[in-house]
């Protein structure tokens, strides 16, 4: 499984990228707005930090507007992936953009049928939202299992990005189910790094080392 960082905060991206575990970044209008900075400026800066797919989302609701915005965003950097919402207009846009060689990430997916349609329209990635499904008392990870099964059945190349990740268990289960990617908030990534027994073990080693009076 690959890891993308789900944020528009460049400081978080720098910190995570230094770990050597991040393969890309996903952003959305809400994350960009949270930073209070110019959209294009933020996206450009991210492309200078991470050498991998950077998802930037269109704002228009109609396919023509989506296509126009996507073409402009794609000019920023070769690693830009266009996030398109899972709507009929979105599928029309993906169909056109895929034929132009522009990579797309179809977002706000909540059913396996939506993922299948997006893949057939030419999406490079699909992003099922597991956390938001959990929020409405639905098993969010079931959608991952369903999409993985369907894509494997028909040799579909579209990659599955597990999105709306709320905690490390989401990541673990998605990895076991065969999702290609998990896009995680910085907080969740740090939770994955740490364990209290690891911290306790380090302190024990340090204490034993000090007692023995050893040096490197």
UniProtKB/Swiss-Prot annotation:
Keywords: Cytoplasm, Pentose shunt, Schiff base, Transferase. It catalyses: D-sedoheptulose 7-phosphate + D-glyceraldehyde 3-phosphate = D-erythrose 4-phosphate + beta-D-fructose 6-phosphate. GO terms for biological process: carbohydrate metabolic process; pentose-phosphate shunt. It holds the Pfam family TAL_FSA. The active site is at 83 (schiff-base intermediate with substrate). It is found in: Cytoplasm. It is an enzyme of class 2 (transferase). One of its GO terms (cellular component) is cytoplasm. GO terms for molecular function: aldehyde-lyase activity; transaldolase activity. PROSITE patterns: TRANSALDOLASE_1. Its main location: cytoplasm. Its EC number is 2.2.1.2. CDD domains: Transaldolase_FSA. Pathway: Carbohydrate degradation; pentose phosphate pathway; D-glyceraldehyde 3-phosphate and beta-D-fructose 6-phosphate from D-ribose 5-phosphate and D-xylulose 5-phosphate (non-oxidative stage): step 2/3. HAMAP family: Transaldolase_3b. Belongs to the transaldolase family. Type 3B subfamily. Transaldolase is important for the balance of metabolites in the pentose-phosphate pathway. This is Probable transaldolase. It comes from Thermoanaerobacter sp. (strain X514). The gene is tal.
């Amino acid at each position: 499984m690959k890891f993308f960082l789900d944020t528009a905060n460049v400081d978080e991206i720098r910190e995570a990228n230094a770990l050597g575990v991040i393969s890309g970044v996903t952003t959305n209008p809400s994350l960009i707005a949270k930073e209070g900075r110019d959209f294009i400026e933020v996206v450009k800066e991210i492309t200078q930090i991470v050498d991998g797919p950077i998802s930037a989302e269109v704002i228009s609701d109609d396919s023509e507007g989506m296509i126009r915005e996507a073409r402009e965003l794609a000019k920023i950097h070769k690693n830009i992936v266009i996030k398109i919402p899972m709507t009929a207009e979105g599928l029309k846009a993906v169909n056109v953009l895929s034929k132009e060689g522009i990579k797309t990430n179809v977002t706000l997916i909540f059913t396996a049928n939506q993922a299948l349609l997006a893949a057939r329209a030419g999406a490079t990635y699909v992003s099922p939202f597991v956390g938001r499904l959990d929020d409405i008392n639905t098993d969010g990870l079931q959608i991952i299992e369903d999409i993985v099964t369907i894509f494997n059945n028909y040799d579909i190349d579209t990659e599955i990005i597990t999105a709306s990740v709320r905690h490390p268990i989401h990541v673990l289960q998605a990895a076991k189910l065969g999702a290609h990617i998990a896009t995680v908030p910085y907080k969740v990534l740090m939770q994955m790094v740490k364990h209290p027994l690891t911290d306790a073990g380090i302190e024990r080693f340090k204490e034993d080392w000090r007692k023995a009076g050893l040096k490197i």
